[in-house]
Amino acid sequence: MKKILGILILGLLLSGNAYAESEKVKTWGKNSQIPEEYYNPNLKTLRYHFLKYNKRGESQKKFYTKPSSQPSSLKFNLQKEPKIIKKISKKMQSTGLISYLMYENGEIVIDQLSPPERFGDLIDNDTMIYSMSMGKSLGGYLIGHAICKGYINSLSSTLADWPIVKGTLLETATVQDLINASTGDQKYIWNNQLDSGRDIGDLTIASITKKELANTKPGKKRFNYSQFSPNVALNYISFKTGHKFSSFINSVLKDHVGLAGKLRMNGTGVESKGVIQSNFKASRYDTLRIGIAILNDWNSDTCIGNYLKDVYANRVSKGVYNVGDGYSQSYAGFFHTNYPGISDTVMGMDGYGGVALLINFDDNRIVYTHAVHRNYNYNSLVLKAIDKGKF
């Protein structure tokens, strides 16, 4: 009997230790996020990394937009089936999903935010939330406006007029090459790492072109996903606007899109050195407003609408180098395209942790999720939802 009792006590102690271990915050180094293959992080770990990720760039010089005096209005018609809402709520109780918005035919039809016991005490409708890779797609949209405003001649223009890239593989790259992440830089760059080991996110364009890319020639023009091309694109806009990037993004995001609050992009140092980073912070509703503006632009007979269609028509295959969202098969102007099983015309913005904003131009639908981990069934809540409007 004593032996059995001892085994039971030992078992309780071990299970208690295992439980305590499971409730600890797990980290992956100073600047690391939760790896997506680490499938089931506990709530403390998710909350810790959400707060850490959302504080990125706070010490840097910031490129802000001002709130619009006449923000674009949002119409609500929350009438989706209860079982659909129940599925979203269930995922919000057990995964890294924080916010879910669906927009159809001019109205927000789903609007769900994480409950207070999960993330709802950390975020509300006015909280500026951070996304890195969605900033790549925003850069593609801003390039279109730079063309339409006359700062850049066309998609076929080269970067040869920019002194900072002289003597590098970027000198002969076209704007089209750049926004399709196909400048032939794969020998020197993989994801966010340079061949020297330096991280792109810590560097200016001037620093990279002076060191790693000095006297380089482009390789085969194929898709190579990284932060570098979108950083180059944003800083090329800065160069073409006389290094008045803040003024330019205000003309687009405040005046054209009609953001209700601020949008922030990061960068530190002298603007002419190429300091602007392809990330942004904005509220969940303002991020949706960007998607709505892109949808409306596509449906308009305007310069920016035609630009978006040209970009989509000239998309490139990701091939075997399919990194980024891991689902789409093609890339167009820093937007993900050609999602498996979806025949509609869809362009997507995608970020770390399951942050996604997909636009279905055929069905006039947008699905926008914010999350800290992609363990919420992306296939159903994003891909099936953008295709069918339900899941």
Show the residue positions of the predicted features.
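Bacterial N-terminal signal peptides
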Residues: I7-S15
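N-terminal leader/targeting segments and the immediately adjacent pre-domain N-terminus
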Residues: Y19-D121, K149-I152, A385-F391
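Structured C-terminal helix/loop/strand segments within mature extracytoplasmic catalytic/sensor domains
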Residues: E21-N40, G348-F391
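Active-site SXXK
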Residues: G106, T127-S154, L178, A233-I237, ...
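Catalytic-site signature segments of enzymes, centered on catalytic residues
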Residues: D126, I189-S278
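Active-site helix/loop module of the DD-peptidase/beta-lactamase fold
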Residues: K149-G184, T241-A282, N299
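Active-site-proximal alpha-helical segments within enzyme catalytic domains
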Residues: S229-Y236, I276-S300, V355-V372
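Active-site Gly/Thr loop motif
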Residues: A260-L263, A313-I366
